Amino acid sequence: MKSIKWLPAFVAGLMLTACVSAPLIPAATAPTANATVPSVVTDIDDMTAVSDFAAQHDQRTLFVFDIDDTLLTAEQFFGSDYWYEWQKAKDLPNEQQVKCKFDYIALNYEAQTMKPTQADAPAIFNAVSQPKLFLTSRGGNYRGATERELHRNGYSFPSALDGSAEGRIWDWQSADDSRHSTLSYFRGVFMTSGQDKGVMLLHLLDRLQLRDRFDRVVLVDDGKANIDNMRNALAAARVPYYGFHYVRIDKPQPVNPELAEQAENDYEQSRSYLKEVFPGRYEELQAGRCAY
């Protein structure tokens, strides 16, 4: 979910000085010029498929995991990933559109608890011994709440791919300057602010000088667009790819009327709370002066 502003606490948290040496791993074996590069996408509704794949592959395999509705899922509709997809629909009636939706998402992230998409998902993730990272479309200003819920639900934070203990935060823009975001990579969580995940992963590997380290990339993600974007980017880079499209969390569109009504009621309650307790912020949001 896209955002562009940063929490001062996060910036302070990145100022770490300790470093450890990156493990020595043989360089990846590049496909020959005429070789067919594997590119396989499989629908799954159980994370055990990922652990089965991991058991058959070595340390030159990079595992990439989405967070929302892949590892964690919201316990309510309002402010969830499902709600966000509904809110950004072009045909959504004006009366159902929420002003400053990213602000309300931020408020929800801070207030809500999340749960694993399946009971054994944390154990399956933690058992993957190969290099891995969380790759999320969330922006960096959601980092504190994101890390809190991952930790609370039992997910371990992977070591940085290059072995560094330092966090990184930097500005990125596309070659044609049509897209730009602030990105961050810290505690194994790569936050990309809504950008193309395939482009972002290759960008991170280049930035860490690790493009030649891996023989293959595995992405586990509930978003078909993310699965396809990764496939396209890695095919162009001639990197073998295995995508696991995680379909366990059902998010039918259009949203049924009962769920839409529930979201509208929750939104009104949130607005009433802000108006009573934090009137200054309420007025900012009502005026469309979005902070995120």
Predicted features along the sequence, with ranges:
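Bacterial N-terminal signal peptides that target proteins for export
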Residues: 1-10
